[in-house]
């Protein structure tokens, strides 16, 4: 492998090899450069190298080389310049397509040339033997050999590009474009096998995308752009599948689209949904699924009516007619199902899946056939107004088949309606996404439905009818067709009848007791036997028994009812227990099954991974060996050719041939050949120089002579052209003079007309200018008046705002003065109260001091009689403050007394406290603790407190003054109250 310092050198080397006809060597040189680890950063020359590389790959049909190169180039520019990769891939696809088109244009018999079932399959041995034996050398064979290889290469190109671009968020648009081109290739050349493989490839890519969610640069399907690209690709797939007639693949495409919609939980655009349901109608009609076909048409009608604003009334009527006819085409009976549980489950799963595809989300616990049925659809068409939008013929047909009873003339009523319907249809002008509507496709199904309705109605009025009469009632079919239809109806329990060809009659009614009629027959037979027995053996009278039973009947019924309720509850409980056990067993079995399945899957994945790794390893080793062997063979062949050409000695037979020895020998030979070639080229260049010099010497006089002849010819041509131009100029001048003379006589009229026009336009101009000036002056006056009015309004508003502002300021000042006055009054009141409290406190201190001195005198035990306390004088309330002030002034200073000790009432004060002061003092609670109860001082104070309380509570007791100075015993008790010391002896 040659190592190039710059990529441009490799490109130049490839061009040199191409010029000498060695395209394979040029391709190998570029391949070595692209796959080299030296050039892992993107450069602009690499893009040109890729263009040249792909040109060589296409010319030599080397798809594998192209794939390797594109993979390496994707690694190089994926994170740097994705647009370069897009250009390279587009160039590759363009080259392959052009080559295929060229081959196609060269083939005259295209149909025979393309008559190949599988592009990837080789020719059959039988075809090869036949061509050899028959000596086929004609044009068909040459066309096949010319066109088919290029189509095969183009198909491999599409596969390669899709494999390179798959599951990459940066290459989604290019992936979608490539898939679209591949679909168009399959569509254009009717490649059904390749189309199936292409669908499977795209399906596997999406499955791998969902499987490996941690992949780098993985597309995000929740993004609107990515989802739209994937949906567009699937819709292209669906369209091509229907156009190619691959209905099974079309149905799988529908499932792919539904899977995408479920995966991202987002509804596509209405235009895509219309295409989706239109293709569903075609698929279900081809598969004879008339029920789902009708529901798909109903969905399509709803979408067109709700989202297509340009839908004309004619198109709406045609779509509604299609919906109604599709619903009527559904067979009026359900197909009989087998009793196999597996088949029933499969049918239920199929119905559920079909309902989901159509857009009806059913619960798995409900049967799909119960939710999606002919009767439900017809009632919904009537309730949603679809029938009212249909044509009159369809409405009449609906009423005749579904609501009316005409057993004898049903065929004659329906036949003209079907003829009119078969002529209706056409392309929808306002709904281009929908296929062409042909109502005639429903006529056979409607004829079959009419036959079934006729048989059903005839069976209700006849028990036996002749075959000829029945054939006359059914104008659509021969009796053999009617018989086939009736067999299907009898099989599905729609009508009960039997055809007797020997008698030529048709018998209606329940004709046997087998199958489902056995149960009813036995019941009727048992009932008849019971009646006969009752007639033969009448029941004896039971009046006497009833007389004894009736009184206890209510209790018996109540007991029986309770017993039945208890039995019912027991049964329900047992059922619940059984169901719970069954659910538990099923849950355990499901867990075991899931666990076993998980283990099996893990083991299978490990085995597959090991096999894949082993296969990959073997494949790599095999490829390396094959590549080395091919290189050795190529080198050996090239060496042998050169030896033969140069008549050199070949390798000996006994000599060991290895790759290394062949390479060394080949390199030696190449070096020698290169030296010889350089010598030959030098000699050839010298010879060519001599020849070129001689040729130029001989050609010089000839060139000079030709130049002189050319000068003479040019001079003559110039003179002729000059003379012709002068003559033409003279002719034009003469014609202009004649034209001037002809027009000069009209000069006066022209001036008169000009003056008239100017005067008229001047007058009109003056009038318009005057009107304009008046209009402008009027506008100026109006604007001035408006400005004056606006100024006055602004002035008035300012004055009013100023007045309101002054009023507000005055009001605020007044409020502020009032608040200050109230504050001052409150302050004076508080000051007066404080003075009154201070005077009261001083008086209390004085009284307490006086009482203390008296107690001390009493405790000394002197013989002098105790000083009698002065009688308190009662002063009016209004004189409280002056008296308190006088007492405070005359009293000496005393120590501070706490507030809780200030509750005694002064006995020597000149006046009593006011009511407010009394309330305030009475609200004070007793002091905390028990100290004032255990001391002499506390005893005295408590005595005074009790005395004060008696004074407040009422007048003093008889025999003593109001201060309690009564008998001696009372004084003793009062003086010793609350004291722990012994009382002194009184004399």
UniProtKB/Swiss-Prot annotation:
InterPro entries: EIF3A (IPR027512), eIF3a_PCI_TPR-like (IPR054711), PCI_dom (IPR000717). Keywords: Coiled coil, Cytoplasm, Initiation factor, Protein biosynthesis, RNA-binding. Residues 93-122, 556-742, 797-858 form a coiled coil. SMART domains: PINT. Its main location: cytoplasm. Residues 808-987 are annotated as: Disordered. Residues 905-916, 976-987 have a biased composition (Polar residues). Residues 872-894 have a biased composition (Low complexity). Pfam families: eIF3a_PCI_TPR-like, PCI. Signal peptide: none annotated. One of its GO terms (cellular component) is cytosol. GO terms for molecular function: mRNA binding; translation initiation factor activity. It is found in: Cytoplasm. HAMAP family: eIF3a. Component of the eukaryotic translation initiation factor 3 (eIF-3) complex. Binds to the translation initiation factor TIF3H1. RNA-binding component of the eukaryotic translation initiation factor 3 (eIF-3) complex, which is involved in protein synthesis of a specialized repertoire of mRNAs and, together with other initiation factors, stimulates binding of mRNA and methionyl-tRNAi to the 40S ribosome. The eIF-3 complex specifically targets and initiates translation of a subset of mRNAs involved in cell proliferation. Belongs to the eIF-3 subunit A family. This is Eukaryotic translation initiation factor 3 subunit A.
């Amino acid at each position: 492998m040659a190592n190039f310092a710059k990529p441009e050198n490799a490109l130049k080397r490839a061009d040199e090899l191409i010029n000498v006809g060695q395209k394979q060597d040029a391709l190998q040189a570029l391949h070595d450069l692209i796959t080299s680890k030296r050039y892992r950063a993107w450069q602009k020359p690499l893009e040109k190298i890729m263009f040249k590389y792909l040109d060589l790959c296409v010319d030599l049909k080397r798809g594998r080389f192209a794939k390797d190169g594109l993979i390496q180039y994707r690694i190089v520019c994926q994170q740097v310049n994705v647009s370069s990769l897009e250009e390279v891939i587009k160039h590759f696809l363009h080259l392959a397509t052009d080559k295929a088109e060229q081959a196609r244009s060269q083939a005259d018999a295209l149909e025979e040339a393309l008559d190949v079932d599988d592009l990837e399959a080789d020719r059959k041995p039988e075809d090869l033997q036949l061509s050899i034996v028959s000596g086929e050398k004609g044009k068909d064979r040459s066309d096949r050999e010319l066109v088919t290889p290029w189509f095969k290469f183009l198909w491999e190109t599409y596969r390669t590009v899709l494999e390179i671009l798959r599951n990459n968020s940066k290459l989604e648009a290019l992936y979608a474009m490539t898939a679209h081109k591949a679909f168009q290739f399959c569509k254009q050349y009717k490649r059904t096998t390749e189309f199936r493989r292409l669908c499977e490839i795209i399906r596997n890519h999406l499955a791998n995308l969902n499987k490996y969610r941690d992949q780098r640069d993985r597309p995000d399907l929740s993004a609107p752009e990515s989802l739209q690209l994937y949906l567009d690709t699937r819709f292209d797939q669906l369209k091509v599948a229907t156009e190619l007639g691959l209905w099974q693949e079309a149905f799988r495409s529908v499932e792919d689209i539904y899977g995408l919609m479920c995966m991202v939980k987002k509804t596509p655009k209405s235009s895509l949904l219309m295409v989706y349901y239109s293709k569903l109608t075609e698929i279900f009609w081809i598969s004879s699924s008339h029920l789902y076909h009708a529901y798909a048409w109903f969905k399509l009608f709803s979408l067109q009516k709700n989202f297509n604003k340009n839908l004309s009334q004619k198109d709406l009527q045609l779509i509604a007619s299609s919906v109604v006819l599709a619903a009527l085409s559904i067979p009026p009976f359900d197909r009989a199902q087998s009793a196999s549980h597996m088949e029933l489950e499969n049918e239920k799963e199929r119905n559920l899946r079909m309902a989901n595809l159509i857009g009806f989300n059913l619960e798995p616990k409900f049967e799909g056939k119960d939710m999606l049925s002919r009767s439900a659809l017809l009632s919904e068409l009537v309730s949603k107004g679809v029938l009212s939008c249909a044509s009159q013929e369809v409405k009449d047909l609906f009423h005749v088949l579904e609501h009316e009873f005409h057993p004898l003339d049903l065929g004659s009523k329906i036949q003209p309606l079907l003829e009119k319907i078969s002529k209706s249809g056409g392309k929808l002008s306002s709904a281009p996404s929908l296929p062409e509507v042909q109502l005639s496709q429903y006529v056979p199904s409607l004829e079959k439905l009419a036959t079934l309705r006729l048989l059903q109605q005839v069976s209700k009025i006849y028990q036996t009818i002749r075959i000829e009469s029945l054939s006359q009632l059914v104008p659509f079919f021969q009796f053999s067709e009617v018989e086939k239809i009736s067999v299907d109806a009898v099989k599905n329990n729609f009508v009960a009848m039997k055809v007797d060809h020997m008698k030529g009659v048709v018998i209606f009614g329940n004709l046997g007791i087998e199958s489902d009629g056995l149960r009813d027959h036995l019941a009727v037979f048992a009932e008849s036997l019971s009646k006969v027995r009752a007639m033969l053996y009448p029941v004896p009278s039971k009046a006497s028994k009833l007389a004894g039973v009736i009184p206890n009947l209510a209790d018996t019924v109540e007991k029986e009812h309770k017993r039945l309720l208890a039995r019912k509850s027991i049964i329900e409980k047992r059922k619940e227990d059984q169901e719970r056990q069954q659910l538990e067993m099923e849950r355990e079995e499901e867990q075991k099954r899931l666990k076993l399945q998980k283990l099996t899957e893990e083991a299978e994945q490990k085995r597959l991974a090991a096999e894949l790794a082993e296969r990959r390893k073997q494949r790599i080793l095999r490829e390396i060996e094959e590549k080395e062997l091919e290189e050795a063979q190529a080198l050996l062949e090239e060496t042998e050719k050169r030896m033969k050409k140069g008549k050199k000695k070949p390798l000996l037979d006994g000599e060991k041939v290895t790759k290394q020895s062949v390479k060394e020998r080949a390199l030696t030979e190449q070096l020698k050949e290169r030296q010889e070639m350089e010598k030959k080229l030098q000699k050839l260049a010298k010879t060519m120089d001599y020849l070129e010099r001689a040729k130029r010497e001989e050609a010089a006089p000839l060139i000079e002579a030709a130049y002189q002849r050319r000068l003479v010819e040019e001079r003559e041509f110039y003179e002729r052209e000059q003379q012709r131009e002068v003559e033409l100029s003279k002719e034009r001048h003469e014609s202009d003079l004649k034209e001037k003379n002809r027009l000069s006589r009209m000069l006066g009229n022209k001036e008169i007309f000009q003056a008239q026009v100017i005067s008229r336009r001047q007058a009109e101009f003056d009038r318009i200018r005057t009107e304009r000036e008046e209009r402008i002056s009027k506008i100026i006056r109006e604007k001035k008046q408006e400005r004056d009015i606006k100024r006055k309004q602004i002035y008035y508003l300012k004055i009013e705002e100023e007045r309101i502002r002054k009023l507000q300021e005055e009001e605020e000042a007044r409020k502020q003065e009032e608040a200050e006055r109230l504050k001052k009054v409150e302050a004076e009141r508080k000051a007066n109260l404080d003075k009154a409290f201070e005077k009261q406190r001083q008086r209390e201190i004085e009284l307490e001091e006086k009482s203390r001195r008296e107690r001390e005198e009493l405790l000394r035990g002197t013989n002098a009689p105790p000083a009698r306390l002065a009688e308190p004088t009662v002063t009016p309330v209004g004189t409280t403050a002056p008296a308190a002030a006088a007492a405070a002034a005359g009293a000496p200073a005393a120590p501070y007394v706490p507030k809780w000790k200030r509750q005694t009432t002064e006995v020597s004060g000149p006046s009593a406290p006011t009511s407010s002061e009394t309330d305030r003092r009475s609200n004070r609670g007793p002091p905390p603790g028990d100290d004032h109860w255990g001391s002499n001082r506390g005893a005295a104070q408590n005595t005074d407190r009790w005395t004060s309380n008696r004074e407040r509570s009422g007048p003093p007791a008889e025999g003593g003054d109001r201060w309690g100075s009564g008998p001696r015993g009372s004084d003793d008790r009062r003086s010793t109250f609350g004291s722990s010391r012994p009382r002194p002896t009184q004399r």
